[in-house]
Amino acid sequence: MNVSETDTDGDGNRGPLAGVSVVEMTAHRAGPFCGALLADMGAEVVKIERPGAGDPARSQGVGPDGKSGYFMANNRNKKSVTLDLKSEAGVEAARSLLEAADVFVENFGYGVTDKLGIGYEDLRQRNPDIVYASIKGYGESGPYKEKPGLDMILQAEGGIMSVTGPEGGQPVKVGQAIGDLTTGMFAAMGTLARLYEGERAGEDEEFVGKFDVGLFDSIVTLMNEYLTEYSMDGSVPGPQGTSHQTLVPYQRFETADGALVTGVPSDDRWGDFVELLGREELAEYPTNDDRQEHAEKVVEIIEAEFETESTEHWLDSLTEYGFPCGPINDVEGVVEHEQTAARDLTIPHEDPEWGECLLPGHPIDFAGYEPEIREPAPRLGEHTEDVFEDVAGDQTTLEEWTAGGAFGSD
C-alpha cells in the first residue's frame, strides 16, 4: 500500500495519516489509546466490538450523567462496528474488513487471533502488506507470554512502583495508568515504523509487518538509567519522593500558600540561585557534588526561604532569573492553564448525546495541520451497517453474514 497515493478527498488538513485504514480489536486503554493517536493523525480507525456489550471501558468510570470519560477520551475519531467472532460469519466479515486494511491493532490474549483465523500468518495470505500490531501484558515471547497483565500489576512487576512514592515510604503506583498509556504510544510508534518500512520495501523484498509490545516491556523501558546503574554498581533505589536522584536541588518545595517545583540544572547557575534566595550560606556548596553530600542541610535552607513568600512571588522571581519552575497543578489547573489552550491540548467538543465536554488533543503539533475531533466517541455498533455494506460488496454477502449471526442476534 502506497499511502502517498491514497485518496485524501483533496483535503490537505486531514493529517499525516490521511488515507491509512486501521482496524482495531482492542479494549480498555492501551490498544484504544494507540488507535486514538493514529486517528488523531488522520487515519480512519474502525473499532470492532462485541455485540451488546462492547468495550468494557464503556461502562467504566460512568458518572451519574451516564458519561464514561474513560471511554470517550480513548475512542475519539473512531467508528464502531459490532461483530460476533464466535460465529464463522462474524470471523469471515472481519477477515474481509482486514483484507483491505493497512493496519490491524489487537490486544487479545496470547494465541487467540490464531485460533480465530485472524492471526498474522492468516491475514498476510490475503493482505501481504498489512501492519499487525499485537499488544499483550508480557508480549508474545518468554515464559510469561500467556499470563494476563494489567497496568498496576505491571507497574509493580516492572519496577516503576518501587521508585515511586514518598522518600523512605512504601512504593505506590503512578497516579495515571502509565503502563497502558506508554504501551499505546509504543504501539503507535511501531505502527508508524512498519508503515514506513512497507513504503520503502521493494517489490522483490518480503515485508514482515507484524510487531508486538507488552505492558511489561514498556514499564521496564521506563526504568531507563536505573537498569544501567544497577549493572554498574548494584544500586537499588527506593521511592524517590519528589527529589531528583542526582541533582540537588531539583524537587517540590512548600511556599507560604502552596507548593512549586524548581531546580538548578548546572553549577554555573548556582550563584544566581543563591542571589535570588538571598541566602549567602548556600554559597558554601558551589558544586552539585557538594550539594549532594550536604543535601539535607541545603534543602532545609531552601525550604525555609521558600516558605516566606507566596507561590506566585517565587514563580515570578525564578522566571525572571531564568530558572525552570512551575506550580503543582491539579486537573482544574491544567485545563485552565493558558499553555494548554495555546497548544490545543484539550479540544472542546459537542457530543450529540452527552453534550459539551473536553477531549484530549494530540501532543505533536504538525505544521499545516489543525487537530480536530472528526468523530465523537462512537455509540456501540453505530457504523456497522455503513462499513459492512461497503466491505460485503453486494447485498447477498451482507445478508449471508447477517443470517449467519455475524452482527449478533437482535
Regions found by a protein language model. Give the residues of each.
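N-terminal helix-loop segment corresponding to the beta1-alpha1 unit
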Residues: M1-E206, R379, E385-D410
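Glycine-rich beta-alpha junction loops
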Residues: G52, Y138-G139, L215-L222, D257-A259, ...
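Conserved Rossmann-fold dehydrogenase catalytic segment
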Residues: E140, G168-I178, E199-I219, S235-Q245, ...
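Flexible glycine/proline-enriched surface loops and loop-helix/loop-strand junctions
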Residues: Q170-I178, E254-D257, Y369-E372
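Oxidoreductase and adenylate-handling cofactor-binding alpha/beta cores
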Residues: G184-G209, T221, E225-S231, V274-E280
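Short Gly/Pro-enriched turn/cap motifs at secondary-structure boundaries
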Residues: Q240-Q245, Y250-Q251, W354-C357, P376-R379
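Aromatic-enriched alpha-helical interface/lid elements that frame and gate functional surfaces
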Residues: V248-Y321, C325
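A glycine-rich dinucleotide-binding beta-alpha-beta segment and adjacent secondary-structure elements
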Residues: Y321-R374
